[in-house]
């Protein structure tokens, strides 16, 4: 029975392992996070599409593109000069407004014209993830807070679609998020001390 489960979900399990590797390396500011994330995203494109989570499926294409962007951005910086940045409250207002407006409009579109499962929730986590991924590439500390909200909602979304290994992955993400935030906060504080 367990063997059958692994056989039927092998692609998802490989994607999960690569995604864990991605986030673990990102917490350590290791540039190898990006190729692991790219490969995981390619696999997840097919997984999400077959689960009827079309926004999540196409989000994976964005992740691949952002993976290459993040990889190129991080190549410009050595580990000794890894700089963590922060956004103003106004930028967060714009980002959150952007997510909410696009979530509603694309959720409405998906609800009206496709057989998408949970289109509004799918749209919200997709647009939120787009902003959060951009924030990771720009090394903004608040990315971890955005990911906490997105991943918490995603767990429920994936459970509802029977993607249990992926829901488990996002549970692991929730734990790693705390370590990532703490690690990046130390770097931000160190950067601020150097500037002062």
Annotate each language-model stretch with its function.
Residues 25-39:
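Membrane-interface helix-loop junction between the first two transmembrane segments
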Residues 35-39, 55-58, 145-149, 167-169:
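Hydrophobic alpha-helical membrane segments of integral membrane proteins
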Residues 61-77:
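Membrane-water interface of transmembrane alpha-helices
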Residues 38-43, 63-67, 98-102:
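Mid-membrane cores of alpha-helical transmembrane segments in multi-pass membrane proteins
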Residues 28-32, 44-62:
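Helix-loop junctions on the outward
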Residues 41, 45, 155-158:
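Solvent-exposed, amphipathic alpha-helical segments
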Residues 1-28, 77-78, 86-145, 149-196:
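Polytopic alpha-helical membrane-helix bundles and their juxtamembrane interface segments
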